[in-house]
Amino acid sequence: MPSYTLHYFNHRGRARSAVCCSQLLVSSTMTADRVFRMGQHEKQDAMSHDANVGIGQQNPNSPEYAMARYLAREFGFHGRNNMEMARVDFISDCFYDILDDYMRMYQDGNCRMMFQRSRDMSSSSEKRMRFQETCRRILPFMERTLEMYNGGSQYFMGDQMTMADMMCYCALENPLMEEPSMLSSYPKLMALRNRVMNHSKMSSYLQRRCRTDF
């Protein structure tokens, strides 16, 4: 059984789904995790500011979502057969679309995070409208998709938590901090996020993780 060290930043960004996947793995497989603060990793191993941080000693250019998929497949959170895997993928992709459009609102022209609203109000407004439209398009579909298994009272794949459920939690975490009523019309999704948050291994991670503004 291989072991891994997961490197990630102390912000709730695109790699958070990979971090959440890691918290559900048996303890013997995850040897350690290493949290970088912004500006710290550029001094490590001659990495540039824009470099992605990969898994262990593998290619450091692996995208963060690929890391989440890899961990989910490796340890059984990606569905039990090809049809389930396809379902987990399209649900995860939908939530990633929401997360990606949200993160774009905080990126400058070079795709670097600003962690503050853009001073270019026209650009910021256009990006926010895009994010809101993505939510209007995807959230009703995700609510209906969740209801297809056991009326939406468990997880997207029934009684088994998968990467799709973790993506629901991670992708909506920051948007809900800005707009707490965002899921008021989607009670099944809100209840699902609470189930993920209260999962025994997830809750312990959420309690001990670094508190950040973003």
Swiss-Prot record:
Belongs to the GST superfamily. Lens. Residues 2-79 form the GST N-terminal domain. One of its GO terms (molecular function) is glutathione transferase activity. GO terms for biological process: glutathione metabolic process. PANTHER family: GLUTATHIONE S-TRANSFERASE. This is S-crystallin 1. Residues 81-214 form the GST C-terminal domain. PROSITE patterns: GST_CTER, GST_NTER. S-crystallins are structural components of squids and octopi eye lens. Contains relatively little GST activity (1/1000 of that of mammalian GST enzyme). SUPFAM superfamilies: GST C-terminal domain-like. Gene3D superfamilies: 1.20.1050.10.
